[in-house]
């Protein structure tokens, strides 16, 4: 490529987003953590993109976010005017199930992740499950989740299958965490597993739930110390290896991607804008006001994490596949 051609392409990119609209699709129903993060990004990202395009948010739920991801891969414009965020649980499914998920996330261009995840499993005070030991000892429980390949379903399946808790049943099919939480409040299910940010403020404060387990090694002061980390419960090296593999995708807890057909120079523009937004004072103040944790992974680093996930040894992938079967 000649210098003149490269300069011309750069000028085209500089002008591309002027008077354009970017659609940010959220593969989850309104109200949950993915939706909150998507709307937060949409409120601030435009200021860091040359041309200051309008950014609109469109919720496109279905099949645990798979519908929105397939739309991005097969139908969405490939010029950089559509960005997608999705239930990160699809990452684990796609790296273990291969063609069955119909999507491979290493074949998308990653813009970044707004935070690393901190996930917990909780049980309603109305249930018989007060602690992890109650669950581990054989007390019956029914936990609710979104799609069968969602992070919530994967978290519950991990507890059940890694620790042989056959008495723990999973009900999937709730449109999103908002509806799952409502099912817990109505005592339709005993509990759920979810991102900490998606757990309603009043649940712990008002003593409505017991926090049983952390699915992430990190924690916060407001999470009860009685909530045990799953990696500490795993009592064999083989189980600990599986836990390590399962939590690796939690590095990309709030992911944002575009089609791999978007021109590389435009991907670079979006990555740069994303990184700048994550350090923007106005953005950070908005995040703090909304109680949204910001612990970003930039686009290049996210791309490498995904490539590493798909390079998982076949024997480990087989074990993870068995654990996630729900």
Sequence positions of predicted segments:
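Boundary of Sec targeting at the N-terminus
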Residues: 9-11, 58
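Hinge/capping helix and adjacent helix->loop/strand transition within the periplasmic-binding protein
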Residues: 16, 22, 47-52, 71-82, ...
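Short, hydrophobic alpha-helical packing/hinge segments within bilobed ligand-binding/sensory domains
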Residues: 66-69, 180-181, 200
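A ligand-binding cleft/hinge motif common to bilobed small-molecule-binding domains
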Residues: 88-100, 153, 157-163, 186, ...
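Extracytoplasmic "Venus flytrap"
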Residues: 23-38, 62-64, 144-152
